[in-house]
């Protein structure tokens, strides 16, 4: 719908007759149908009479339907139970026989003060997401500073399961191996490991001469795990792990949904349906880890 100022401009210019209809429409950036509709409706009226008529007219579009109170209570309850976003909550309620769009869910959450608004609008990414087909085919790992300590996360690429994590005073190869050993003993041995060129994972060459492998590289080699290195200065390669770091920090420091990393990891793996998985079945990373396991790997 055009603003009051533009409508007044259309009517005034059409009445004066100095410009053609096409020129007026181009100046006001109005379509042909919009131009003639406003001319028919407001022809001969002054700015103040147009404002008065607009104030008395009904807003365009269908009137919004009132959301039943039981639906509103169900939305708030799901949010408190699962900490999920509007799309996942809408899917959950549809499974329970409550038909409600994710837009209405978002509106209810926003009115209840349960939406964490972004300080800056994020632009759509231009690259295409990639992922492995089977669980244990590829794990990603990285370090991040969190509350004065170093946090490491190991993520299964296919299922988005957080296979291991640890919080340490320093980011070292030994601590990386410790967390990886625990993850392997719990979930199994991956075929490949994706890391950056960080010193904890890779011994870079010095002055053009090849360096000897560090402890992490030797551990991967001894366990038959293929080491895949991300491109230099390209954090998107390990973007899934970076996203997990953001999730942990946001849920603890901004939204205050949880108080510890362990709580966030349990919620991510066992409770929250992941939007990159089978959302129609509200699949969690733990469920996807079992479903995507290769038949030769299953016990």
Name each model-derived stretch.
Residues 1-19, 72-82:
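Short, amphipathic alpha-helical "recognition" segments used to contact nucleic acids or chromatin
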Residues 10, 35-38, 75, 89, ...:
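Mobile genetic element proteins and their domesticated derivatives, centered on retroelements
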Residues 26-37, 94-104:
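Short, basic interhelical loop/turn and adjoining N-cap
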Residues 49-139, 211-214, 284-290:
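Basic, flexible linker segments flanking DNA-binding modules
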Residues 99, 103-162, 169, 173-191, ...:
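Mobile-element integrase/transposase regions
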Residues 195-197, 206-250:
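RNase H-like two-metal-ion nuclease catalytic core shared by retroviral integrases
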């Amino acid at each position: 719908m055009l603003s009051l100022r533009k409508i007044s401009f259309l009517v005034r210019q059409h009445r004066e007759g100095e410009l053609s209809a096409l020129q007026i429409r181009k100046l006001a950036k109005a379509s042909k149908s919009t131009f003639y509709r406003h001319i028919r409706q407001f022809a001969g009226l002054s700015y103040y009479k147009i404002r008065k008529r607009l104030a008395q007219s009904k807003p365009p579009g269908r009137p919004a339907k009132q959301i039943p109170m039981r639906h509103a209570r169900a939305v708030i309850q799901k949010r408190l139970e699962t900490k999920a976003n509007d799309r996942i909550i809408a899917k959950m309620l549809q499974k329970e026989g409550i038909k409600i769009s994710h837009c209405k869910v978002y509106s209810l959450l926003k009115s209840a003060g349960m939406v964490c608004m972004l300080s800056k609008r994020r632009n759509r990414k231009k690259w295409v997401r990639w992922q492995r087909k089977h669980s244990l085919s590829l794990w990603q790992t990285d370090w991040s500073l969190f509350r004065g300590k170093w946090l490491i996360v190991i993520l299964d690429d296919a299922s988005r399961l957080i296979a291991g994590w640890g919080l340490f005073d320093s980011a070292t190869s030994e601590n990386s191996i410790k967390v990886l050993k625990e993850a392997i003993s719990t979930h199994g041995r991956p075929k490949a490991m994706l890391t950056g060129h960080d010193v904890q994972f890779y011994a870079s060459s010095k002055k053009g001469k090849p360096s000897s492998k560090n402890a992490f590289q030797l551990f991967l080699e001894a366990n038959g795990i293929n080491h895949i290195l991300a491109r230099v200065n390209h954090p998107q390669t390990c973007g899934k792990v970076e996203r997990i770091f953001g999730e942990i920090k946001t849920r603890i420091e901004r939204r205050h949904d949880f108080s510890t990393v362990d709580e966030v990891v349990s919620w991510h793996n066992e409770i929250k349906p992941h939007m990159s998985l089978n959302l129609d079945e509200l699949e969690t990373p733990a469920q996807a880890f079992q479903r995507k396991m290769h038949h030769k790997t299953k016990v």
